[in-house]
Amino acid sequence: MLKLGIIGYGFRAFTMLKEILRTGKVVVSAVCDVNFDSVKKYAEENGVGEFNYYTDANEMLQKEALDGVFVGTRCSLHTDLARLVASYGIPLFLEKPVATNREDAAKLKEILYHSDKTVVSFPLRVTDIVLRVREILESGRIGTLSQVQAYNNVPYGRVYYHDWYRDDSETGGLFLQKSTHDFDYINFLLGSLAPVSVCAMESKMVFKGDKPAGGVCESCPEKDTCPEGPDRLREIGVDPTGNRCCFAVDTGNQDSGSAIVRYENGLHVVYTQNFVARECAAKRGARLIGYLGTVEFDFPSATITIYDHMSAKKEVIDLSADKGVHFGGDRRLAESFVAVMQGEPSPSTLAEGILSVEMCLAAKESTAEQRFVPIEFRR
């Protein structure tokens, strides 16, 4: 059995570990985290047996003979922990975003020697739906690609205003939290084409206000009438995802953001994300428009639609059987990580993670500075 160490055993590690353990090839040997009670709870739910517990990652790596390490800490710690694991030469599963600022991105470029031994948590690129769309593109069925229109209307956006995710000093903001996934699957679909520049804009129209900083729902005089209060959310069947006021002066995060990405051959991608959409308004996917046809796909409905420009024909491909977290991508990433621990190359390398971060940081800078920002990193 392959021996796995975990650094940061939070909810994301918990969900991914379900898939990793399901392969039947891995055991958890060691865990590093600062909250033992939480670790114990998640480990019991995952069915993890005995393991050695640490609060210092370097000590764990020194003492344990590990075949792989899963890093699932908060975002601001990803870079330094990736560098630490790489220094031991151990295969790494690294949560996204791999960095939250330019300085950390530069640090990661120093360990590109570890790129193929790193699986970055980009499950969308390995879903059945994205793999099938790439096959369609490579077949030439839609002809010369003219434009990509991508979108992500997030139905669970409350977490980015009620919980710790609202702190962009920790997360890097919502381009880095959400667009990093979408930019990556777009890069995957476009093959070897390199993005060269980005312009972007964001808006904050709903989740803002003049309520005091640091406010929590329990002590708010408007908790019984606020449409985002926990009691009101439970009434409509929604589990509250935090208790911090989303109409306070310190709410943070955009409500929506859009970016235009230019690629080296002149192609441009239009991407937009929204965190106010709810319930059946959820939508995530893209339209890729070519001379001969258009291929459109939607993750929530797991459908691909191909429109023939030379006739009135339309083909719909239903992939709804591929269920699971991240539309089945987590399962495939888990299998890939096990393969990397056995010596196979990664399907979502550190280089891909850095490129996505560079695009997100360019979008963030473009928003602040109102200019096109070049992307100089190449895979």
Predicted ranges, named:
Residues 34-37, 279, 323-335, 351, ...:
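Active-site loop of classical SDR/Rossmann-like NAD(P)-dependent oxidoreductases
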Residues 1-48:
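N-terminal Rossmann-like dinucleotide-binding module
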Residues 177, 181-301, 333-344, 379:
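Contiguous beta-strand/loop segments that form the cofactor/metal-binding neighborhood of enzyme cores
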Residues 10, 46-111:
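Beta-loop-alpha module in the N-terminal Rossmann-like domain of NAD(P)-dependent dehydrogenases
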Residues 30, 67-68, 147:
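Short, Asp-centered acidic motifs that coordinate Mg2+ and/or phosphate
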Residues 76, 99-162, 167-175, 180-183:
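A contiguous active-site-proximal alpha/beta segment in oxidoreductase catalytic domains
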Residues 25, 68-70, 264, 296, ...:
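C-terminal helix-rich "cap/oligomerization" subdomain common to oxidoreductases
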